[in-house]
Design a protein with these regions (language model features):
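An anion/phosphate-binding loop that grips the pyrophosphate of nucleotide cofactors and donors
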Residues: 80-81
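N-terminal targeting/trafficking signals and adjacent low-complexity tails
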Residues: 1-20, 25, 75, 126-127, ...
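C-terminal interaction surface of TIR/SEFIR-family domains
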Residues: 124-175
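Conserved TIR/SEFIR loop-to-helix hotspot centered on a Trp-containing motif
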Residues: 90-104
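Short hydrophobic alpha-helical runs that function as membrane-insertion/retention elements
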Residues: 85-86, 112-118
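Extended, compositionally biased accessory segments flanking or bridging domains
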Residues: 1-57, 64
């Protein structure tokens, strides 16, 4: 168990609004929630609360990013992570915005510590072809160089059920 960092773009900010984000929006302060550059990212990482709350739960730290900050944020968070959960629902040739992140994962963290969430909208053939292509371009210092081929840990979901939640947590614990 440990702290959770989540990267989100403007689309997620507008689709899933939490109470504190709504208050920031109403007060005109929502823009300050977005990572403003390298110095701001470093400050946010340094200030991240990594300790559990008194009830034992860990907080989720959200890193809202725009086009000019998300790649640096991905790189820094992946480099500091013990495990990574990546949502690849709807991933396809027409919706392949996560290719950069997949490449950074393969180059930076042991793939055994990564859980890829997929569902019926994920083009699994395209995903496997993408992983194979990225595998052929691994960085020389990638921790995955020792493996012969990518062995990704997939967690297929179909809806918000207790059984799927337990399975997802099980995958994360194993990672």
């Amino acid at each position: 168990a440990g702290h959770v960092a989540m990267i989100a773009g403007p689309d997620l900010v507008t689709s899933l609004v939490e109470p504190d984000e709504f208050l920031a929006y109403v007060s005109g302060d929502l823009g300050r929630r977005f990572v403003a550059g390298d110095a701001d990212l470093a400050a946010r990482l340094a200030a991240m609360d990594r300790r559990p709350d008194p009830d034992g739960r860990f907080r989720v730290t959200e890193f809202f990013c725009r086009d000019d900050t998300w790649q640096a944020t991905v790189q820094r968070l992946v480099g500091e992570s013990d495990a990574v959960l990546m949502d690849l629902r709807s991933f396809s040739a027409a919706n392949q915005g996560c290719v950069y992140e997949l490449g950074r994962l393969l180059d930076t963290i042991d793939l055994a510590r990564v859980v890829l969430v997929i569902d019926g909208t994920t083009d699994r053939g395209f995903l496997e072809a993408t992983l194979t292509r990225l595998w052929a371009q691994l960085a020389p210092d990638s921790p995955n160089r020792q493996a012969a081929a990518p062995a990704a840990r997939f967690c297929e979901v179909s809806g918000p059920t207790a059984a799927e939640s337990r399975a997802l947590v099980g995958h994360l614990i194993a990672a």
